[in-house]
Amino acid sequence: MEEKTGLNIIYQRYADLVYHVLAHIPLDNAADEYDAEYVRTMREQLGRSPAIPEKAAEWYREHFDRVCLIGFMPFVTGGTEECLAALRGSGMMDEADMEHFALPFFRAVEEEKDAYYAWWEKKQAETEDRKPGAEAGLREFIRRFDGFFGHYDRITVILSHSLQRNGRMFMNPGGAFLYLKFPGNEAGMEDTRLQLLHECTHPLTDPKLGNDIRMDDGSHDLAEYQVFLYDEFLIERKAPELLERYRDWIGREWLEEARRALAPERTAMLKEMACE
């Protein structure tokens, strides 16, 4: 399967730096990366916290459907200057977004860079002995679901030391980029593998909604519900021994909510897709 898909696993300190700063902004939606325990721990270890202006944080929350691109460009850029140029050229963010959010946000990123990079390099060294097992676990998981991951010619997984909550996926001409938490133990390895499956399901099921998917109109919730149920059907068919673990990971209450929210014919369609 690996030969067919082309799996590449990397570590990207600039993306981790950006997500370190994002982890300090409460968002209150499905893309929220805020983690109070992480914020406290990193303040103790670095002796500082990002100085994000509250007005910039408010702009991020209020205009998230436009400025969310800020969480994806770091995967394919190597620094702030390149990232800002990519954001300006994207056509998604206007000058007001740049002035009120992107520029003050990236000033905070640059102020954190030296302290964070020193911490990151130390973390890389500390986790060196766990990397082979973590990477092998992802490769084996992809082989297990070979028919599913065969939808992708190339997958690049960035394992992150900063990501605390929700994974990310970004499609570009170079293939699929996934941003996943580096697993600290076996339970974390299961979480990372299931997050990989979750993120890779979105491009298959999201088009079935037939419109732009946004946070502010509820369509993102429906997109998530589709993924919840598709993956449940897929795991039941391909790896039934993981089914209860998956249900606990998603949350059984969320699976029930998905079944209530989606029409029976849509649920049947998702089951049929997962069985192809």
Regions found by a protein language model. Name each.
Residues 206-224:
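Post-HEXXH active-site segment of zinc metalloproteases
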Residues 161-163, 182-186, 201:
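Short, flexible loop/turn elements at secondary-structure junctions
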Residues 173-188:
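Acidic, His- and aromatic-enriched active-site or binding-groove loops in soluble protein domains
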Residues 218-276:
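Long, well-structured alpha-helical subdomains associated
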Residues 190-210:
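Active-site recognition of the HExxH zinc-binding catalytic motif
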Residues 71-122:
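Interaction-surface and assembly-scaffold signal
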Residues 1-78, 238, 252-267, 271:
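N-terminal mature-domain "stem" immediately C-terminal to a signal peptide or N-terminal signal-anchor/transmembrane
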Residues 116-173:
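Auxiliary, metal-adjacent structural segments of Zn-dependent hydrolase domains
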